[in-house]
């Protein structure tokens, strides 16, 4: 379990204060939830990114708040793509024995046999709803697609669960399918079409008629 230090923010801060805070490499955040009151804090952006890379989006973090250490998860965060900057974080204090339902990313593993034969792998479902205690929430759910032929598919019910969690999605929801290759014209057909285009006569414009039309427009 990763640790992250925070500093309590005192008083009401203006937009200018928050801008200055972010420019100094800190991120304004709030802590709320189980066993704690709403507390405004700030954390180091670089350290926060390191922690998320270590524990994952749904990982548990030991957050230092004043003299206390609170077990939290990242409930939400905002990111400014123009400035490439995290602008705000919501830390949710949690009860480690209480189940939570969160979104977990689906990770496809292997190369489908059908894809090697020209088929196209389509993935309509990128995340799954998972219920578990915080320590049992998987970082990702791997789905092996290496045996899939063209026209084969895998649904939620086909997932082999290796952990103490429950998937809440409809068992019939499709996760991945291999569709047949699209029909593309052969090289001969492409050359024939190009030849037809090259031999087409361009439309001849009557210059006198064109001039008359221009005069009529001016009138």
Swiss-Prot record:
Q: How does it assemble?
A: Part of the 50S ribosomal subunit; part of the 5S rRNA/L5/L18/L25 subcomplex. Contacts the 5S rRNA. Binds to the 5S rRNA independently of L5 and L18.
Any single Gene Ontology cellular-component annotation: cytosolic large ribosomal subunit
Q: What is this protein called?
A: Large ribosomal subunit protein bL25
Positions of the UniProt region annotated as Disordered: 176-219
Question: Pfam families from the entry?
Answer: Ribosomal_L25p, Ribosomal_TL5_C
Q: Which Gene Ontology BP terms does the record give?
A: translation
Q: Which family does it belong to?
A: Belongs to the bacterial ribosomal protein bL25 family. CTC subfamily.
Q: In what ranges is there compositional bias, type Acidic residues?
A: 184-219
Keyword annotations for this protein, in alphabetical order, are:
Ribonucleoprotein, Ribosomal protein, RNA-binding, rRNA-binding
What does this protein's UniProt record list under function?
This is one of the proteins that binds to the 5S RNA in the ribosome where it forms part of the central protuberance.
Q: Name one GO molecular function term.
A: structural constituent of ribosome
Question: Please, which domain of life does this record's source organism belong to?
Answer: Bacteria
């Amino acid at each position: 379990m990763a640790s992250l230090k925070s500093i309590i923010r005192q008083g009401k801060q203006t937009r200018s204060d928050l801008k200055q805070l972010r420019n100094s490499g800190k991120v304004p955040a709030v802590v709320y939830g189980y066993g704690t009151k709403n507390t405004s804090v700030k954390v180091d952006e670089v350290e926060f990114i390191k922690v998320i890379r270590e524990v994952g989006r749904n990982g548990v973090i030991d957050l230092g708040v004043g003299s206390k250490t609170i077990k939290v998860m990242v409930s939400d965060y905002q990111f400014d793509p123009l400035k490439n900057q995290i602008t705000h974080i919501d830390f949710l204090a949690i009860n480690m024995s209480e189940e939570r339902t969160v979104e977990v990313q689906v990770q496809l593993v292997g190369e489908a046999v059908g894809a090697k034969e020209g088929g196209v792998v389509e993935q309509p479902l990128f995340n799954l709803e998972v219920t578990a205690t915080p320590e049992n929430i998987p970082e990702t759910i791997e789905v092996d697609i290496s045996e899939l032929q063209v026209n084969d598919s895998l649904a939620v019910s086909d997932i082999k669960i290796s952990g103490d969690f429950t998937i809440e999605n409809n068992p019939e929801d499709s996760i991945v399918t291999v569709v047949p290759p699209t029909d593309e014209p052969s090289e001969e057909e492409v050359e024939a079409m190009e030849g037809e285009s090259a031999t087409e006569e361009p439309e001849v414009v009557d210059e006198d008629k064109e001039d008359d039309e221009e005069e009529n427009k001016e009138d």
